[in-house]
Amino acid sequence: IGHLRQRPVVWAVGVGGLFGYHFFYFLALRNAPAVEASLIAYLWPLLIVLFSALLPGERLRWWHVAGAVTGLAGAAVLILAGQDFAQPIQLMPGHFAAMACALLWSGYSILSRRLGDVPTDAVGGFCGLTALLALLAHLVFEDTIWPQDSWQWLAVAGLGLGPVGLAFFCWDHGVKRGHIQALGASSYAAPLLSTLVLILFGFAGLTWAVAAACLLITGGAVLASIDLLRASKR
């Protein structure tokens, strides 16, 4: 219980980041084309790299920015492949919500680094309060649809334990203790790994876009980690 006794600003950063990001992400998907909303929201790794220059003791070098931009290009290739852009893109409320996602998650990550004295165990409290706020938002804005079979219940449990559970603890540890520029650039591997899992289970095919994304995202992560790789060779 001791790790839950944190300053109000810590709770504001933790809950604001976790709940705010997901609230605006779902809002973006409801009010803009999913591809466009996803691509805008996925500016957060690049913003983490850029905002890291504001942290004490951190130096932003050209290869950090180049690596993050290369990773963004890889994610863009993957997300935009096969899309028809015959119609011009028009700004919608969902686009602004997606930008809020990017700003919230990058801001949360950078501020978590700044609040490095806060134990990672406190994330459990942030998740609990976020879950309560998410329930209230669901009841106000959405219709309730229950899982239809045991597999769907298992999928819901898996999401709660993994991507919206354990992952938050790992992320907190990473942004507080890891190489934040390399972490930001390598985050572009998330959509790539999702696509590779779909390919592995036969739900998607291996295309030039996937191959190009592999090269760009991997290359971007390596480029952003140059100083880390140099240090390991000394």
Language-model regions: role of each:
Residues 1-36, 40-41, 77, 160-178:
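Specific transmembrane alpha-helical segments of multi-pass solute transporters/efflux pumps
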Residues 3-8, 80-102, 140-158, 205-215:
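Juxtamembrane helix-entry segments on the extracytoplasmic side of multipass membrane proteins
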Residues 6-15, 60-72, 95, 117-128, ...:
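Cytoplasmic-side transmembrane-helix entry/capping segments in multi-pass membrane proteins
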Residues 15-19, 23, 45-50, 76, ...:
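Hydrophobic/small/kink-forming positions within alpha-helical transmembrane segments
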Residues 22, 37-43, 111-132, 161-200:
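Helix-helix packing/entry segments at the starts of transmembrane helices
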Residues 28, 54-60, 115, 122, ...:
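Hydrophobic/aromatic residues within transmembrane alpha-helices
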Residues 48-50, 54, 86-142, 156, ...:
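Transmembrane alpha-helical segments that form core, pore/gating elements
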Residues 51, 60-82, 127, 131-134, ...:
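Hydrophobic transmembrane alpha-helices of multi-pass small-molecule transport proteins
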